[in-house]
Amino acid sequence: MNTSYSQSNLRHNQILIWLCILSFFSVLNEMVLNVSLPDIANDFNKPPASTNWVNTAFMLTFSIGTAVYGKLSDQLGIKRLLLFGIIINCFGSVIGFVGHSFFSLLIMARFIQGAGAAAFPALVMVVVARYIPKENRGKAFGLIGSIVAMGEGVGPAIGGMIAHYIHWSYLLLIPMITIITVPFLMKLLKKEVRIKGHFDIKGIILMSVGIVFFMLFTTSYSISFLIVSVLSFLIFVKHIRKVTDPFVDPGLGKNIPFMIGVLCGGIIFGTVAGFVSMVPYMMKDVHQLSTAEIGSVIIFPGTMSVIIFGYIGGILVDRRGPLYVLNIGVTFLSVSFLTASFLLETTSWFMTIIIVFVLGGLLFTKTVISTIVSSSLKQQEAGAGMSLLNFTSFLSEGTGIAIVGGLLSIPLLDQRLLPMEVDQSTYLYSNLLLLFSGIIVISWLVTLNVYKHSQRDF
């Protein structure tokens, strides 16, 4: 019996190791190209509005894909979907590397990479829930969370070094490493019984069209894109009210505290994602830093600090309550943006400190938004509601990156608004940092107002 237990325990540990590898490279794929955006812009002679689509394209299919894979896991099985995700991710890597001289091929490759990488976060949690014993799941989730945090931390550093000393196109090949997990996962994961069920393909297509055209509007400001987006969403809303198993539960729309929490959380997450995508442009223009310096010196310390803030945030939520932690997180965010807008021209190390507090504030806010939103859901709404929150979180990051890319390309914002004598290179970034601070404060006030008038005690 001890031998059987040891073999089972060994199998669970092996599964966990390969899941950690997939989780690490999923996050790395998202973060690694961020520091290279200015280099890509120079190579293709493109404005930030276009260049930021390198990340937006990935986040778009990544966010939609996480929801799709989660829905399909029971119908098609985890093994099939993981294999499909890995192959698609690697296929996108090859296309991107081979066609990196063509901007349209690069964007297409990032769409494909996102569609493949989405399988990892969506299915890893399902695998842990199904294969890891209940008494070890907490440790498993904690380990995966730490690996994800490490991926977020080292991603900019790795990206900066490779882009500076070799070429940014080689970053596209990094996800190819995930292919080594295939034979092991196929052997370790059991054969699953497929469950028949309905899949709302029409709903996914309508929502995807609406999202894509809205993002195109945020970077080109073409009214025709906005019209197509609005029409797609209207048809989507009408559609999900008719079908029996819709992609998004329309009943959640009646839960006002939940919807406001998701919306305000999405705005905050998107604002921070947009800020992080702006940092490489800002450091290049204002402080003339290299790509390696931006990744290793400026962004790396901030991304690694999230491990500490995550631990502290969890303790504070339990001891002082979610709204207390939300106030701290929003204060970190708004004050950091406001301070940076006035002191942007100081030493580049100052931005490292700002990023530490921005990402720390984001982590506090994420923890609280999840707590508050889940508390506003009835028991039968919990699964669909939290899935929608995760989907919105990923999607808002891609949207934030797209919107900030569009704002960086507007000449009207490149004017001096602050009553200070500063270099002209700081005008655009200082104005956007002021805007970010205002958005954070407004989202915070709306969230507080809604939950203070709700019937639940948070």
Curated annotation (Swiss-Prot):
GO molecular function terms attached to this record: antiporter activity
InterPro entries the UniProt entry points to: MFS, MFS_dom, MFS_trans_sf
Main location (coarse class): membrane
Statement: the UniProt record of this protein carries the keyword Cell membrane: yes
The entry's keywords: Antibiotic resistance, Antiport, Cell membrane, Hydrogen ion transport, Ion transport, Membrane, Plasmid, Transmembrane, Transmembrane helix, Transport
Keyword Cell membrane found: yes
Spans through the membrane: 12-33, 81-100, 111-129, 140-162, 165-185, 201-221, 223-240, 256-276, 297-317, 324-344, 346-365, 432-451
GO terms, biological process: proton transmembrane transport; response to antibiotic
Domain of life the protein comes from: Bacteria
CDD domains according to UniProt: MFS_MMR_MDR_like
Localisation: Cell membrane
Lipid bilayer topology: Multi-pass membrane protein
Gene Ontology CC terms: plasma membrane
Function: Resistance to tetracycline by an active tetracycline efflux. This is an energy-dependent process that decreases the accumulation of the antibiotic in whole cells. This protein functions as a metal-tetracycline/H(+) antiporter.
NCBIfam families assigned: tet_MFS_L, tet_MFS_L_K_45
Protein family: Belongs to the major facilitator superfamily. TCR/Tet family.
PANTHER family: MAJOR FACILITATOR SUPERFAMILY, TETRACYCLINE RESISTANCE PROTEIN
Protein's name according to its UniProt entry: Tetracycline resistance protein
Species this protein is from: Geobacillus stearothermophilus (Bacillus stearothermophilus)
Gene encoding the protein: tet
